[in-house]
Amino acid sequence: MPRLVERIRADEGRPALPYYLIGHSAGGQFLVRLAAFLPTEAGRIVAANPGSHLFPTRERDFGYGFGALPVELSSDEVLRRYLAAPLTLYLGTGDTLVEANLDQSPAAMLQGGNRLERGRACFAFAAELARARGWTFGWRKVETPGIGHDAAEMFAAPEVAAAIFGR
């Protein structure tokens, strides 16, 4: 990712060009994991309606948390950086259906029964951990009313500006 950004900045002749990373569903899942492990200069990372989340805990195995990872990928410093990342969980309040492609493994169901529940639970868990440890918390949670698992509707909703820019 950093080389791609460098290339675009070089091609545009704008070495300080700001950028934002936005993904829906599996794209959101990818960006949550990117926020956890890859330092970025992104102004904001927006994960819209991911099917599962990466809870900032070693009590849940990787894929759903940081458990069973080597210490260099799961230390308190890694968790602290993850919680400080400019991550927005952008959730449609209508994304409550349990579809065949939604991860229904026991580890996923521990996060919540659907995408909305999982996003809310992960945000609350992360916010409480940051508060308890006195760590910077760079995450935001933005909900858009009534929208289900639909990228076009999510990104056309007025709340998308708040998800990306905080407005």
Describe the function of each predicted region:
Residues 23-25:
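Conserved alpha/beta-hydrolase "nucleophile elbow" surrounding the catalytic nucleophile
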Residues 43-131:
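The feature captures the conserved acid-bearing segment of alpha/beta-hydrolase catalytic domains
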Residues 27-29, 51, 94-95, 148:
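Catalytic metal-binding/acid-base residues of hydrolase active sites
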Residues 103, 123-167:
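C-terminal catalytic histidine-bearing segment of alpha/beta-hydrolase fold enzymes
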Residues 13-14, 38-40, 79-84, 135:
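Extracellular/periplasmic catalytic domains that process cell-envelope and extracellular macromolecules
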Residues 1-12, 19:
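Alpha/beta-hydrolase active-site loop
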Residues 1-4, 27, 118, 122:
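Stable alpha-helical elements in mature extracytoplasmic
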Residues 28-39:
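Short glycine-enriched nucleophile-adjacent loop
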